[in-house]
Amino acid sequence: MTPPLIELEGIRRSYRSGDVVTHALRGVGLSIHAGEFVAIIGASGSGKSTLMNIIGLMDRPSDGAYRFGGRDVATLNRDELAALRRGCFGFIFQNYHLIPTVSALGNVEMPAIHAGAPRAYRHRRATALLTRLGLANRITNRPSQLSGGQQQRVSIARALMNGGAVILADEPTGALDSKSGTEVLGILKKLAGDGHTVILITHDSKVAAAAERIIRIEDGLIVSDSGPDPEKVSSSIAVVPWQASDSSPPLWTWLEEAARSAFAALAINPVRTALTLSGIVIGVASVVAMMAIGRGAQASYIERASAIGTNWIVVDRAGESTGNSLPLTPADAQAIKDMDNVSGSMPAMWDMATMRRGNIDLNTDVVATTAEFRTVHNWDMAKGTFFTKQDEVSGGPVVLLGATLASKLFPGIADPSGSNILINNLPFLVTGVLESKGLSERGTDRDKRAVMPLRTATMRLFGKDDLSEIVVSIADMSRLHETKEAIKALLIRRHGREDFYIYDSASAFQKAEDERRSSNLLLSAIAAISMLVGGIGIMNIMLITVSERTREIGVRTAIGARTADILGQFLTEAVVLAAIGGVVGLLLGAVIGVGAALLFGMTVIFSVTMALGALMGAVVMGTVFGFMPAYRAARLKPIEALARG
């Protein structure tokens, strides 16, 4: 006689609710051999379902011993029990317990997915099982598109996917019409005939009559047992003791299937998914667009500032000259030029004037200066010639035009040199056009100005010789601070007081950089808060998802999903959700950046590193905030999950 496949000795199961203890099983002893077709019959509350759950390793007894294939299952941990369920048991439930978002083929494949079987094998075997059960033309249908009988056949195919050495059928005909019920019982009889151990749980004596052995249970005790078929017990069916396996699906297969399931689950409620994504999308888009615009602004600032050199100091008057202050004068500029480490000193007077040519009138800046203008600002001519030393001395009526100003006064004329214009109704000769320098660091157009000799402006236009500023070029920028202090001391000696102020290109750059950093910090904080809100949204939606899919968790666990499988499944969904939000955020950020460039003429510079960092931040956010819901799902016991679902 072969040893029993299933041995139960003194099995008890009690449940406590407050101070009330309910005894579902009161010392059940039972042996079932491989290949038997057994029906366990009892009324509602008799303990038959509790007994099935213990036999199927979905629940543990409060007391007693259970051996499967000769091994005490009490020694197995949670994942070892899952492996045993996955490899040896197949479950057929009264309410089918099919996953509604997955096709018939996908439902049948699921046990093999958790076993790590290759996709081609899974597809081939699941198709063969469904075809064998008469569902060849329903493979791609979802459960909602199948009748009750068809859904139960899908459930049977799922139970057989990993072999199904032991088939546990819990009221398999309870939700079916008589014809479908008869068909299901016929399938179970055939499975028993093929060598499967079939355990049928029912309250109906007519259904139980289909089995070869009938066990009756009442009030948690077995009250009758027709006994096993002696021929089956003494048959040559050998029971190979089962060994727990710690093997798991290959990582890539596991990730692929988890991601596939995640996308399917998220597609169920696209509106809710989109709303959950919004926080992550806004956060990532803010980071990408902000950094692109910020980097572009910084590059533009440096480019604009570099157009006229970056090795300068500006000495500016402290306000209008009064009795208590002295104006800046050309003599001050000359004194500065004679100092050590000064390569050029440009006196400058700024004022507005009206330019006229024909019927074209323009109000623009006039810069009155010396030939030092070219040296200090590194500004060459595009057309014509710079004014001469003789022009400076005589104050001749000559003027140079910026590129923008020239194009407005002389539209369609490439070189206006030699032409005459009126400035404040006085005639001036245009001797040349300056090369284009673009916008200043303050955003004003450097090319929309006129330049003339200092003496010319003093004598003919402005009637004053007070300088607006003195621009000083520095030979050695490493001695910038030393030179600034020397200029300051010189002017205090000349003026008798500090009635001026000095700033330099480095300070201007630093100020602009500080402002940019402050702005970026503020926007980064806003983006971080947005992503934090998005992460909390992911956690909330995943908690809701776990609650809504409790039955699915129970089904997956019943068919052999490990704790890591469930944890990974829901954690992957959270990460996929965050990653989708991150990718959409990247695209939106790129659109915002490009839109800013096209609509406002802004320079934008995208950073691959920053974009990847923002995307990784979103993924990390999904991982962190998705862990708690995933962990909660992974800790659900199969029997509890099925009952709550």
Curated annotation (Swiss-Prot):
Where does it reside?
Cell inner membrane
Domain spans labelled ABC transporter: 6-244
Instruction: Report any one BP term from Gene Ontology.
Output: response to antibiotic
Give the EC number(s) listed in the UniProt record: 7.6.2.-
Family, per entry: Belongs to the ABC transporter superfamily. Macrolide exporter (TC 3.A.1.122) family.
* Subunit structure as annotated in this protein's UniProt entry: Homodimer.
PANTHER family named in the record: MACROLIDE EXPORT ATP-BINDING_PERMEASE PROTEIN MACB (PTHR30572:SF14), MEMBRANE COMPONENT OF TRANSPORTER-RELATED (PTHR30572)
A Pfam family of this chain: ABC_tran
Residues reported to bind ATP = G42, A43, S44, G45, S46, G47, K48, S49
Gene label: macB
* Organism per entry: Nitrobacter winogradskyi (strain ATCC 25391 / DSM 10237 / CIP 104748 / NCIMB 11846 / Nb-255)
Q: What protein is this chain from?
A: Macrolide export ATP-binding/permease protein MacB
Q: Which GO terms describe its cellular component?
A: plasma membrane
